[in-house]
């Protein structure tokens, strides 16, 4: 990743690892090449500053949300705050980097002095005529693209490299031309070749969309056979591809790059056409600016020693204003918006278990309404007790109409899947699906969450069913509802109090440990005073 955190400032350029960003709060993107966007994705949720073309591309191809993208016009100066109270500001000016569509250099001016960040750039003399640079400003720190910073590498200008490509194509008038490119860059070279040879240049849909955005000449097409010049991905240029292309039509391939690449086929031609400044161009650029220090952007390629004779005296480390320091440290103490949203979501009460259809109580409900509701419940419990005392078997059929369509044969009622039991209560009309023993349900009386464990005991009442054994919800297990159960039968006083309190009659009241012959006797015994 070719990016940097600028010390003693909240500025980060081409740096997208928030975990390692430290106190960086202002993030800038110089251009859209992949080695400068590592870590940048659709999940990015911080303000991002870039050129208008890069703003379009970063949303179109990386799906960065528009709400976080801040497009800054090239050639203009923009004032940005450096704290949360507006006391400290900085000025940032974007200048064309002559590297690829949308690429820019950033000139930062503030309490830290003047910092020029070139990003990837190809030097031209016109850069020194930029209004932001020609006023003789002292550059305190120069972040320099040092990709080709090696005296042993001699590179031609792009005009000279383009001329070499034209001459090579002229030597192969009957050949198709495959030009290997990266996903972004050298579109102007393709336009130049199309106009020179009066032919269409065949592009991929993605690159065609880009050249239309740039407003280049109408010399590009998607039709494979419309022209003899084809722009392809540089990874497609290989030995096997050359064999395949030459089987159908004579073809040569051109790789316009300054990188050292092994030629795997005699028809692959490498032309040193580079979008990075040569060593001699870097020397000219640094000598004209005379910065106080040079910081290489490509850390694996040191270059400081090459410019010692072009540097101005270094300045002391700038003091960070208190308001800026607080701004840089604020996010380390303050939770992010996403964290707060998650916290709020977790704190929001969620409906779980059984939901009852009833009118919602409002905060201003009168005490008279509460008393009326309480009296109604007491009358309901009394009616249930009277019905149970007069017609126990009839009451059994009312409580379990699905199970009593025919005479009970002593086996446990179950669904077709043998996994779930449906329990109906009277006089309420809803059904409760008893789930596995590690789930929770809501208490019928309090609405609180109550665990359904091995003993079906409501919270706050441990006397009713504590001695009755296990009531398994999954009938495929060794359930007390089967004849193999060793659990003791329910005691009448215990169950009667529980039934009146919770309006719930468990199935094992009628089935646990009862034979078909002794069922009526057990019912009569239960209702004796």
From Swiss-Prot:
GO biological process per UniProt: double-strand break repair via nonhomologous end joining; interstrand cross-link repair; protection from non-homologous end joining at telomere; telomere maintenance; telomeric 3' overhang formation; telomeric loop formation
Subunit: Interacts with TERF2; the interaction is direct. Interacts with MUS81, MRE11 and FANCD2. Interacts with HSPA2, HSPA8 and HSPA14. Interacts with SPAG5.
Pfam families in UniProt: DRMBL (PF07522)
Protein name per Swiss-Prot or TrEMBL: 5' exonuclease Apollo
Transmembrane segments: none
Cellular localisation: Chromosome, Telomere; Nucleus; Cytoplasm, Cytoskeleton, Microtubule organizing center, Centrosome
Sequence motif: TBM, positions: 494-509
Organism encoding this protein: Ailuropoda melanoleuca
Major subcellular location class: nucleus
GO molecular function term, any single one: beta-lactamase activity
Gene: DCLRE1B
Bias kind Polar residues: ranges: 357-366, 468-482
Domain notes: The TBM domain mediates interaction with TERF2.
């Amino acid at each position: 990743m070719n990016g940097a955190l600028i010390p003693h400032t909240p500025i980060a350029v081409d740096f997208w690892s928030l975990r390692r960003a430290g106190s960086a709060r202002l993030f800038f993107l110089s251009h859209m090449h992949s080695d400068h966007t590592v870590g940048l994705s659709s999940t990015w949720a911080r303000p991002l500053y870039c050129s208008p073309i890069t703003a379009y591309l970063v949303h179109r191809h990386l799906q960065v949300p528009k709400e976080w993208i801040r497009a800054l016009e090239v050639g203009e100066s923009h004032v940005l705050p450096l704290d949360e109270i507006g006391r400290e500001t900085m000025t940032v000016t974007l200048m064309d980097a002559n590297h690829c569509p949308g690429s820019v250099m950033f000139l930062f001016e503030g309490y830290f002095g003047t910092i020029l960040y070139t990003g990837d750039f190809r030097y031209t003399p016109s850069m020194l005529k930029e209004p932001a640079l020609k006023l003789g400003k002292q550059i305190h720190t120069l972040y320099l693209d040092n990709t080709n910073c090696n005296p042993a590498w001699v590179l031609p200008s792009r005009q000279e490299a383009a001329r070499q490509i034209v001459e090579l194509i002229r030597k192969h008038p009957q050949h198709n031309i495959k030009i290997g490119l990266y996903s972004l860059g050298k579109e102007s070279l393709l336009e130049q070749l199309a106009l020179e040879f009066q032919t269409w240049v065949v592009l991929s849909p993605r690159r065609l969309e880009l050249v239309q955005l740039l407003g280049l000449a109408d010399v590009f097409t998607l039709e494979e056979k419309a022209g003899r010049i084809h722009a392809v991905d540089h990874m497609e240029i290989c030995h096997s591809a050359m064999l395949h292309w030459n089987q159908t039509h004579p073809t040569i391939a051109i790789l316009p790059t300054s990188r050292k690449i092994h030629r795997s086929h005699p028809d692959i031609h490498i032309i040193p056409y580079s979008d990075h400044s040569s060593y001699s161009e870097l020397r000219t650029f640094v000598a004209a600016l005379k910065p106080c220090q040079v910081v290489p952007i490509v850390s694996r390629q040191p270059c400081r020693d090459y410019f010692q004779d072009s540097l101005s005296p270094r300045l002391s480390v700038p003091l960070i204003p208190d308001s800026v320091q607080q701004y840089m440290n604020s996010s380390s103490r303050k939770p992010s918006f996403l964290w707060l949203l998650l916290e709020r979501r977790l704190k929001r009460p969620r409906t779980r278990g059984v939901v009852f259809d009833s009118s919602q109580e409002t905060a201003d409900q009168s005490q008279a309404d509460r008393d009326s509701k309480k009296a109604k419940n007491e009358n309901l419990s009394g009616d249930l007790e009277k019905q149970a005392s007069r017609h126990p078997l009839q009451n059994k059929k009312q409580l379990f109409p699905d199970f009593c369509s025919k005479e009970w044969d002593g086996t446990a009622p179950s669904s077709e899947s043998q996994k779930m039991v449906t329990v109906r209560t009277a006089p309420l009309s809803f059904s409760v699906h008893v789930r596995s023993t590690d789930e929770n349900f809501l208490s019928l009386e309090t609405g609180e969450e109550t665990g359904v464990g091995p003993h079906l005991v409501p919270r706050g009442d441990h006397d009713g069913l504590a001695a009755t054994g296990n009531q398994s919800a999954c009938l495929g297990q060794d359930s007390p509802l089967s004849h193999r159960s060793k659990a003791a039968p329910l005691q009448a006083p215990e169950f009667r109090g529980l039934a009146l309190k919770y309006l719930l009659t468990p199935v094992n009241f009628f089935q646990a440990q009862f034979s078909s012959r002794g069922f009526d006797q057990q019912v009569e015994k239960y209702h004796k005073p």
